[in-house]
Protein backbone atom coordinates (compact mmCIF):
# COMPACT_ATOMS: atom_id res chain seq x y z
CA UNK A 1 0.00 0.00 0.00
CA UNK A 2 1.53 3.30 -1.02
CA UNK A 3 -1.23 5.82 -0.29
CA UNK A 4 -0.31 7.94 -3.30
CA UNK A 5 3.09 8.95 -1.99
CA UNK A 6 5.35 6.46 -3.76
CA UNK A 7 7.69 7.33 -6.57
CA UNK A 8 6.29 7.38 -10.08
CA UNK A 9 9.51 5.70 -11.13
CA UNK A 10 8.29 2.46 -9.62
CA UNK A 11 5.51 0.26 -10.98
CA UNK A 12 5.49 -1.97 -7.92
CA UNK A 13 2.19 -1.49 -6.02
CA UNK A 14 3.66 -3.39 -3.06
CA UNK A 15 6.23 -0.69 -2.26
CA UNK A 16 5.85 0.68 1.22
CA UNK A 17 4.35 4.01 2.11
CA UNK A 18 6.82 6.32 3.89
CA UNK A 19 3.94 7.73 5.93
CA UNK A 20 2.30 4.51 7.10
CA UNK A 21 5.32 2.20 7.04
CA UNK A 22 3.29 -0.52 5.33
CA UNK A 23 5.29 -3.17 3.48
CA UNK A 24 8.68 -1.73 4.09
CA UNK A 25 11.02 0.46 2.17
CA UNK A 26 11.33 4.21 1.87
CA UNK A 27 10.87 5.57 -1.65
CA UNK A 28 11.27 8.91 -3.37
CA UNK A 29 8.17 11.04 -3.05
CA UNK A 30 6.27 12.22 -6.10
CA UNK A 31 3.48 14.71 -5.52
CA UNK A 32 1.52 15.19 -8.77
CA UNK A 33 -0.40 18.09 -7.27
CA UNK A 34 0.93 21.41 -8.51
CA UNK A 35 1.42 22.77 -4.98
CA UNK A 36 3.99 20.28 -3.71
CA UNK A 37 4.92 20.06 -0.07
CA UNK A 38 7.58 18.19 1.76
CA UNK A 39 6.10 15.01 3.21
CA UNK A 40 5.27 15.06 6.91
CA UNK A 41 3.34 12.33 8.71
CA UNK A 42 0.20 13.63 10.39
CA UNK A 43 0.27 12.64 14.04
CA UNK A 44 -2.79 11.42 15.90
CA UNK A 45 -3.27 14.55 18.02
CA UNK A 46 -3.01 16.85 15.02
CA UNK A 47 -5.42 14.67 13.03
CA UNK A 48 -7.87 14.81 15.94
CA UNK A 49 -7.62 18.61 16.00
CA UNK A 50 -8.39 18.78 12.27
CA UNK A 51 -11.45 16.58 12.79
CA UNK A 52 -12.67 18.78 15.64
CA UNK A 53 -12.08 21.86 13.50
CA UNK A 54 -14.50 20.50 10.90
CA UNK A 55 -17.01 19.37 13.53
CA UNK A 56 -17.02 22.88 14.99
CA UNK A 57 -17.48 24.39 11.53
CA UNK A 58 -20.55 22.27 10.75
CA UNK A 59 -22.11 22.86 14.17
CA UNK A 60 -21.72 26.63 13.87
CA UNK A 61 -22.49 26.99 10.17
CA UNK A 62 -24.96 24.18 9.50
CA UNK A 63 -27.74 26.55 8.38
CA UNK A 64 -25.68 28.68 5.99
CA UNK A 65 -23.86 25.63 4.66
CA UNK A 66 -27.09 23.76 4.02
CA UNK A 67 -28.56 26.80 2.24
CA UNK A 68 -25.76 26.58 -0.32
CA UNK A 69 -26.06 22.81 -0.70
CA UNK A 70 -29.53 22.18 -2.12
CA UNK A 71 -29.06 21.17 -5.75
CA UNK A 72 -28.21 17.55 -6.58
CA UNK A 73 -24.80 16.81 -8.07
CA UNK A 74 -24.75 15.80 -11.76
CA UNK A 75 -22.45 12.91 -10.85
CA UNK A 76 -25.22 11.32 -8.81
CA UNK A 77 -27.24 10.63 -11.94
CA UNK A 78 -24.48 8.57 -13.49
CA UNK A 79 -23.72 6.94 -10.15
CA UNK A 80 -27.28 5.69 -9.71
CA UNK A 81 -27.51 4.61 -13.35
CA UNK A 82 -24.42 2.44 -12.87
CA UNK A 83 -25.55 1.10 -9.49
CA UNK A 84 -29.05 0.14 -10.57
CA UNK A 85 -27.74 -1.40 -13.79
CA UNK A 86 -25.33 -3.57 -11.79
CA UNK A 87 -27.91 -4.65 -9.21
CA UNK A 88 -30.48 -7.22 -10.21
CA UNK A 89 -33.24 -5.24 -8.52
CA UNK A 90 -35.93 -7.71 -9.52
CA UNK A 91 -34.34 -10.36 -7.29
CA UNK A 92 -34.19 -8.11 -4.21
CA UNK A 93 -37.14 -8.96 -1.99
CA UNK A 94 -36.97 -5.75 0.04
CA UNK A 95 -36.63 -2.07 -0.93
CA UNK A 96 -33.12 -1.35 -2.21
CA UNK A 97 -31.11 -0.46 0.89
CA UNK A 98 -29.01 2.67 0.46
CA UNK A 99 -26.42 3.53 3.09
CA UNK A 100 -25.07 7.10 3.10
CA UNK A 101 -21.99 7.85 5.19
CA UNK A 102 -21.82 11.57 6.06
CA UNK A 103 -25.27 12.19 4.64
CA UNK A 104 -25.22 15.93 5.39
CA UNK A 105 -28.58 17.58 4.76
CA UNK A 106 -30.05 14.52 3.02
CA UNK A 107 -30.05 16.02 -0.45
CA UNK A 108 -28.76 12.78 -1.98
CA UNK A 109 -31.64 10.89 -0.39
CA UNK A 110 -34.04 13.55 -1.63
CA UNK A 111 -32.56 13.23 -5.12
CA UNK A 112 -32.65 9.42 -5.17
CA UNK A 113 -36.17 9.11 -3.78
CA UNK A 114 -37.54 11.90 -5.96
CA UNK A 115 -35.92 10.60 -9.12
CA UNK A 116 -37.07 7.04 -8.57
CA UNK A 117 -40.65 8.11 -7.94
CA UNK A 118 -40.64 10.56 -10.84
CA UNK A 119 -39.72 7.64 -13.07
CA UNK A 120 -42.89 5.95 -11.81
CA UNK A 121 -45.00 8.99 -12.66
CA UNK A 122 -45.17 10.30 -9.09
CA UNK A 123 -44.32 13.90 -8.14
CA UNK A 124 -40.55 13.68 -7.56
CA UNK A 125 -40.59 16.99 -5.66
CA UNK A 126 -42.72 15.42 -2.95
CA UNK A 127 -41.43 11.86 -2.56
CA UNK A 128 -43.42 11.17 0.60
CA UNK A 129 -46.57 11.26 -1.52
CA UNK A 130 -45.96 7.63 -2.44
CA UNK A 131 -45.44 4.91 0.17
CA UNK A 132 -44.00 2.50 -2.42
CA UNK A 133 -40.62 4.18 -2.69
CA UNK A 134 -38.22 1.52 -4.02
CA UNK A 135 -35.47 2.63 -1.63
CA UNK A 136 -34.82 2.34 2.08
CA UNK A 137 -32.31 4.93 3.28
CA UNK A 138 -29.84 4.72 6.17
CA UNK A 139 -28.01 7.99 6.75
CA UNK A 140 -25.14 8.57 9.18
CA UNK A 141 -23.71 11.96 10.09
CA UNK A 142 -22.02 13.60 13.06
CA UNK A 143 -24.16 16.75 12.80
CA UNK A 144 -27.86 16.23 13.45
CA UNK A 145 -28.57 19.94 12.93
CA UNK A 146 -27.34 19.59 9.37
CA UNK A 147 -29.12 16.30 8.72
CA UNK A 148 -32.46 17.47 10.11
CA UNK A 149 -32.28 21.00 8.71
CA UNK A 150 -34.92 23.72 8.57
CA UNK A 151 -35.84 22.94 4.97
CA UNK A 152 -37.17 19.59 6.11
CA UNK A 153 -35.65 17.27 3.51
CA UNK A 154 -35.52 14.48 6.08
CA UNK A 155 -39.22 14.81 6.86
CA UNK A 156 -40.15 14.38 3.20
CA UNK A 157 -38.02 11.32 2.50
CA UNK A 158 -39.82 7.99 2.89
CA UNK A 159 -38.17 4.99 4.50
CA UNK A 160 -35.43 7.09 6.10
CA UNK A 161 -33.39 6.01 9.12
CA UNK A 162 -30.84 8.39 10.62
CA UNK A 163 -27.99 7.68 13.03
CA UNK A 164 -25.99 10.49 14.61
CA UNK A 165 -22.42 9.20 14.77
CA UNK A 166 -18.98 10.72 14.41
CA UNK A 167 -17.40 7.93 12.40
CA UNK A 168 -13.92 9.43 12.62
CA UNK A 169 -14.11 9.68 16.40
CA UNK A 170 -15.27 6.06 16.53
CA UNK A 171 -12.41 4.90 14.30
CA UNK A 172 -9.80 6.88 16.23
CA UNK A 173 -10.81 5.12 19.45
CA UNK A 174 -9.99 1.74 17.95
CA UNK A 175 -6.71 -0.06 18.29
CA UNK A 176 -4.94 0.11 14.89
CA UNK A 177 -5.26 -3.67 14.60
CA UNK A 178 -9.02 -3.63 15.21
CA UNK A 179 -11.47 -3.94 12.32
CA UNK A 180 -15.01 -3.88 13.71
CA UNK A 181 -17.64 -5.72 11.70
CA UNK A 182 -20.39 -3.60 13.25
CA UNK A 183 -19.95 0.15 13.32
CA UNK A 184 -23.31 1.41 12.10
CA UNK A 185 -26.88 0.80 13.20
CA UNK A 186 -28.00 -0.36 9.77
CA UNK A 187 -28.36 -3.59 7.78
CA UNK A 188 -25.89 -4.41 5.03
CA UNK A 189 -26.61 -2.15 2.09
CA UNK A 190 -27.23 -2.84 -1.57
CA UNK A 191 -25.75 0.57 -2.36
CA UNK A 192 -23.33 2.42 -0.08
CA UNK A 193 -22.31 5.98 -0.87
CA UNK A 194 -19.98 8.57 0.59
CA UNK A 195 -20.13 11.98 -1.08
CA UNK A 196 -18.38 15.15 0.02
CA UNK A 197 -16.68 13.59 3.02
CA UNK A 198 -13.42 11.86 2.11
CA UNK A 199 -11.70 15.23 1.77
CA UNK A 200 -12.45 15.87 5.46
CA UNK A 201 -10.64 12.69 6.57
CA UNK A 202 -7.07 13.43 7.70
CA UNK A 203 -4.23 11.00 6.99
CA UNK A 204 -3.90 7.96 4.79
CA UNK A 205 -4.62 5.63 7.71
CA UNK A 206 -8.07 7.01 8.42
CA UNK A 207 -9.07 7.36 4.78
CA UNK A 208 -8.36 3.65 4.33
CA UNK A 209 -10.32 2.88 7.50
CA UNK A 210 -13.32 4.91 6.32
CA UNK A 211 -13.36 3.11 2.98
CA UNK A 212 -13.00 -0.23 4.76
CA UNK A 213 -15.99 0.63 6.97
CA UNK A 214 -18.00 1.46 3.86
CA UNK A 215 -17.00 -1.82 2.22
CA UNK A 216 -17.96 -3.83 5.31
CA UNK A 217 -21.34 -2.09 5.39
CA UNK A 218 -22.09 -3.33 1.86
CA UNK A 219 -23.41 -6.79 1.04
CA UNK A 220 -21.49 -9.01 -1.41
CA UNK A 221 -22.56 -7.99 -4.88
CA UNK A 222 -23.50 -4.53 -3.66
CA UNK A 223 -22.24 -1.22 -5.04
CA UNK A 224 -20.03 1.36 -3.33
CA UNK A 225 -19.75 4.92 -4.67
CA UNK A 226 -17.34 7.55 -3.36
CA UNK A 227 -16.55 11.07 -4.50
CA UNK A 228 -13.14 12.69 -4.12
CA UNK A 229 -12.88 16.48 -4.24
CA UNK A 230 -10.18 17.82 -6.58
CA UNK A 231 -10.68 21.42 -5.55
CA UNK A 232 -7.11 22.61 -6.09
CA UNK A 233 -7.57 22.12 -9.83
CA UNK A 234 -10.14 24.93 -9.67
CA UNK A 235 -8.46 28.36 -9.67
CA UNK A 236 -11.16 29.99 -7.56
CA UNK A 237 -11.01 27.31 -4.88
CA UNK A 238 -7.21 27.29 -4.95
CA UNK A 239 -7.18 31.04 -4.27
CA UNK A 240 -9.57 30.54 -1.35
CA UNK A 241 -7.25 27.93 0.13
CA UNK A 242 -4.20 30.18 -0.24
CA UNK A 243 -6.00 33.05 1.50
CA UNK A 244 -7.32 30.86 4.32
CA UNK A 245 -3.93 29.31 4.99
CA UNK A 246 -2.21 32.70 5.04
CA UNK A 247 -4.81 33.91 7.54
CA UNK A 248 -4.35 30.80 9.67
CA UNK A 249 -0.63 31.52 9.99
CA UNK A 250 -1.52 34.83 11.64
CA UNK A 251 -4.52 33.59 13.64
CA UNK A 252 -4.19 29.82 14.22
CA UNK A 253 -7.55 28.01 14.09
CA UNK A 254 -6.71 25.85 17.11
CA UNK A 255 -4.03 25.42 19.75
CA UNK A 256 -1.08 23.50 18.37
CA UNK A 257 -1.87 24.35 14.74
CA UNK A 258 1.22 23.89 12.60
CA UNK A 259 0.90 23.85 8.81
CA UNK A 260 4.18 21.94 8.62
CA UNK A 261 2.19 18.95 9.93
CA UNK A 262 0.09 18.88 6.76
CA UNK A 263 0.47 16.08 4.24
CA UNK A 264 0.78 16.86 0.54
CA UNK A 265 -2.74 17.77 -0.60
CA UNK A 266 -3.91 19.05 2.81
CA UNK A 267 -5.41 22.55 2.92
CA UNK A 268 -7.59 24.90 4.91
CA UNK A 269 -10.56 26.61 3.27
CA UNK A 270 -12.55 29.50 4.74
CA UNK A 271 -16.27 30.14 4.69
CA UNK A 272 -18.05 33.17 3.25
CA UNK A 273 -17.02 36.33 5.14
CA UNK A 274 -16.29 34.71 8.49
CA UNK A 275 -12.57 35.20 9.07
CA UNK A 276 -12.61 32.70 11.94
CA UNK A 277 -14.27 29.84 10.02
CA UNK A 278 -12.06 27.12 8.62
CA UNK A 279 -12.54 23.68 7.10
CA UNK A 280 -9.78 21.13 6.75
CA UNK A 281 -9.88 19.61 3.25
CA UNK A 282 -7.68 17.20 1.32
CA UNK A 283 -7.15 17.43 -2.44
CA UNK A 284 -6.93 14.03 -4.16
CA UNK A 285 -5.15 12.81 -7.25
CA UNK A 286 -5.81 9.59 -9.15
CA UNK A 287 -2.83 7.72 -7.73
CA UNK A 288 -3.96 8.40 -4.17
CA UNK A 289 -7.41 7.10 -5.03
CA UNK A 290 -5.98 3.94 -6.58
CA UNK A 291 -3.77 3.30 -3.56
CA UNK A 292 -6.66 3.96 -1.21
CA UNK A 293 -8.73 1.23 -2.86
CA UNK A 294 -5.77 -1.15 -2.77
CA UNK A 295 -5.12 -0.25 0.85
CA UNK A 296 -8.37 -1.82 2.03
CA UNK A 297 -6.91 -5.27 1.40
CA UNK A 298 -4.61 -4.88 4.42
CA UNK A 299 -7.65 -5.46 6.65
CA UNK A 300 -8.43 -8.87 5.12
CA UNK A 301 -6.57 -12.06 5.99
CA UNK A 302 -6.46 -13.22 2.39
CA UNK A 303 -4.72 -10.00 1.38
CA UNK A 304 -7.07 -9.70 -1.58
CA UNK A 305 -8.85 -6.50 -2.45
CA UNK A 306 -12.50 -7.12 -1.42
CA UNK A 307 -13.84 -4.89 -4.19
CA UNK A 308 -13.61 -4.53 -7.95
CA UNK A 309 -13.54 -1.11 -9.56
CA UNK A 310 -16.32 -0.70 -12.11
CA UNK A 311 -15.87 2.87 -13.22
CA UNK A 312 -14.08 6.12 -12.49
CA UNK A 313 -15.23 9.47 -13.86
CA UNK A 314 -15.23 13.23 -13.34
CA UNK A 315 -18.34 15.32 -12.76
CA UNK A 316 -19.73 18.40 -10.99
CA UNK A 317 -18.81 22.05 -10.80
CA UNK A 318 -18.65 24.52 -13.67
CA UNK A 319 -15.83 22.55 -15.26
CA UNK A 320 -17.57 19.21 -14.88
CA UNK A 321 -14.40 17.93 -13.23
CA UNK A 322 -14.61 19.11 -9.62
CA UNK A 323 -15.22 15.63 -8.20
CA UNK A 324 -13.68 12.30 -9.10
CA UNK A 325 -16.15 9.44 -8.64
CA UNK A 326 -15.16 5.84 -8.07
CA UNK A 327 -17.72 3.05 -8.35
CA UNK A 328 -16.81 -0.27 -6.72
CA UNK A 329 -18.50 -3.65 -6.51
CA UNK A 330 -18.26 -5.65 -3.28
CA UNK A 331 -16.90 -9.13 -3.91
Name each model-derived stretch.
Residues 4, 21:
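Cys/His-coordinated zinc-binding microdomains
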Residues 7, 24:
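Cys/His-rich microdomains that often coordinate metals
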Residues 201-213:
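A short, conserved alpha-helix within the catalytic core of class I
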Amino acid sequence: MSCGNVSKQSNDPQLGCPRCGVNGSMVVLFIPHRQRREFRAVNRDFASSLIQLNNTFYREHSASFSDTRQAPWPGWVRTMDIALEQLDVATIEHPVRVFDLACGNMRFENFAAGGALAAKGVDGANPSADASCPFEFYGVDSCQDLAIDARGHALRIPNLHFQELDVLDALMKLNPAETPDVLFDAPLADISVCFGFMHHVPSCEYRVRVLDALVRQTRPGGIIAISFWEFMNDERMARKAVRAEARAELTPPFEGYDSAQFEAGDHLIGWQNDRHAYRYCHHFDDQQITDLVRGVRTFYKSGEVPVRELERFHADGRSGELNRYVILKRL
